[in-house]
Each structure stands twice: as C-alpha cells, then as structure tokens.
Amino acid sequence: FEGIESLKAQIVDVMDDMKMEASHGNVIVMGSENFGRKGLAIDIVKAIQTMDSTFSGKVAKISGEALNKKNIPMTLQKLRNGALIVENAGGLTPITVNAITESLQNEVDYILVVFEGEKETLEPLLNGCVETKSVFDARIVIDDFSNSDLVAYAKGYARELEYSIDDMGTLALYNKIGDMQTIDHVVTVDEVIEIVDNA
C-alpha cells in the first residue's frame, strides 16, 4: 500500500496497537474485498509472528459463518500463542461475537484475532457490544481507492520490484485505470498489479 498515505498511517497505528495479549490489541480490517482486505489481514499476522516472541502457535483462517458453529472457547484455546483470521466476519452472529469477546477477556492469555470484512456488516456487530470494541481496538478501514490512489499504489508496487514509473508512464497509467473504471466495474488492486506486471 505504498503511496496511499492514509492507509499507510492506519497500518502503522495498528502495528503499534496490536498485541498478543488476548484482552486487547486484536485487529479489525474493514473495506471492500477488491482492495486487498484479505491479503492485509494475512500480512498483519505475518508481521506479529516476526515482531512478538510470544507468538509460537498455529495460524487458522475461518469464515464468520463457519465460526458460528464452533465451540468458541475450545477453538481459541487450540490457537493459544497463535492467531485466528475470521474472514467475512460480518457473517458472525452477535452471540458468537460476545462469546469471542468473553473468551478473549477471560479464558485465553495470548492470541491475536483478526476480523476482516465489509464495513457495512462489521460495524453493526461491533457497535452492539462495548467490550468488543475494547478487545478489538486496532482498526484499519480501507476506503474505496480513487484513480490517484491506484496510481500511487502502482508506483509503490513498481518500486518494490525495483522499477520506476516516469511521467509518461504515470499519464498512461491514469488513462488505463480511467478507461477500466466504469459505473459497473471498480478497478481492483489486483488489476493494478497486473497492469504493472505487464508493462
């Protein structure tokens, strides 16, 4: 997310706030799936694996709907000293969210839980329980990217590959993204990566 300053600032804040202590420092990644939400959730877990020496357990991914059917305390105990990524966490029921919150506050010492999902489905769940907000206090909101954001992302991605995009390339990139962007189609980060890879 090189070049998208508002998102980079949120990521830096989350890196400071997230902790393996179960009762706080858990992460929420909200936004459209088209803009790298799942990849960012995975990258956050990879980052804490390298940063925190208490991280020694397993990493698991599960959908919100599937987690509703699990025994929450037992599931979290199995992942102690590890991480759980809940994909499409908006599919969680309020009962499951409360069970996760209670388990993180009382039953598990060290774990990182990452909720990722659409803002429209996650916010109502989080607003329903004050304790959940204090347990999941590291938050990233990925807003829809403008063409300028996508161009900045492309330039950052190119830099990671040790390439640069000159002024003519930047103009061509704006034109390409503008042509692809329609009322029915939102250009995704993956499409921007493909443009750079094909250049």
In which residue ranges do the predicted regions lie?
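AAA+/P-loop NTPase substrate/partner-engagement loops
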Residues: 47-79
